[in-house]
Each structure stands twice: as structure tokens, then as C-alpha cells.
Curated annotation (Swiss-Prot):
Compartments, as annotated in UniProt: Cytoplasm
Native source organism of the sequence: Thermofilum pendens (strain DSM 2475 / Hrk 5)
Higher taxonomy: Archaea, Thermoproteota, Thermoprotei, Thermofilales, Thermofilaceae
One Pfam family matching this protein: Trm56
Residues annotated as binding S-adenosyl-L-methionine: 88, 115-119, 133-140
GO molecular function: tRNA (cytidine(56)-2'-O)-methyltransferase activity
Protein name, UniProt field: tRNA (cytidine(56)-2'-O)-methyltransferase
Amino acid sequence: MSTGRRVFVLRIGHRPVRDHRVTTHVGLVARAFGADGIFLEESVEESVIRTLRNVVENWGGDFKVLTTRDPRETVANWKKNGGIVVHLTMYGENISEELINLISGQGKDILVVVGGEKVPRWLFEEADFNVAIGNQPHSEVAALAVFLDRLFKGEELRREFPGAKLSIIPSKRGKIVVRRE
């Protein structure tokens, strides 16, 4: 989204084979809900990366799919370059309009970190914000969708994706997909 800042997602804790589908969905939600790109650990299957890049090719936009050897280094570099790190967790500060305004009001690039089953302690310490999307067990996919929707105030749902070969025409019933060449 063109907010004057970049918003990227870092997916950590991917377990090969077991998390294939969840990691793909984290990438799909990141793109659809306004993020500019995603960092995936090198352990992520090539098929996940290929799927996300194919979605960008067919459905448009310039969403970046990048890999990282060391998520901690990615976090450190993001902060060194002036960005802030938001870790989504059920243990952090409860999401609120005030907290979203505080994060957004910084005017800095945002790295949103979503983890799997076991998030390393260093992330809680190095994140600028540990944001709880509810204090109950939940999906990182759902947490990311809620956070990005609040961050972009729903505007991401009306965005156009330049270069799209495929687009959906909303309808009460049926599926209307338009192919553009």
C-alpha cells in the first residue's frame, strides 16, 4: 500500500512439510492485506515460494518474496535501517486503536513478525512492540490479517493490484473472474 512507508512480514519458525500450508497462507494474507513483501526462512520449501510468486504474477502487484538465512539478522538489519519491529503474539500488549496509532504514527518502515509454535525469547526482547491479537491461542494467519487490517484501517481491501492478469468482479452469487492480457 502506498502509505509512504514499507510494511514487510517475517515468518519465523517454519517447520518443513508440516507448515507448508500455513506459511503459504501467511504470504497470501500479507499480500492481500497490504504488505509490500515477506521474508521466509531458507528452510521453506521452494513450492511455497513458487506459489506466492505465481500469485503475484497472475493477480498483480509488486509483492516481494524474499528468503533469509538468519531471521535475527533480518530483524537487526531492519532496525539498523530505521524501521520498527512488531511481533504478533498472544502474550503482548492488547491491540487497541491507541497502540495501532502509536505504531503507525512513528512513520517508519514496519517489519511484522509472525511465528510458529515456539518463538525464540530474543524476539520478545528485540521487538519494538509485542502485540497481542487476543490472549488466547490462535492462528498466526488470523493475527496477521487482523493486525494489517487495523494498521491500514480497511483501505487495503479496496486496493487495486497493478499488472493483474486475473481479477474478481464482486457478485452476490457466483464466481466472476476476469482475465486481462
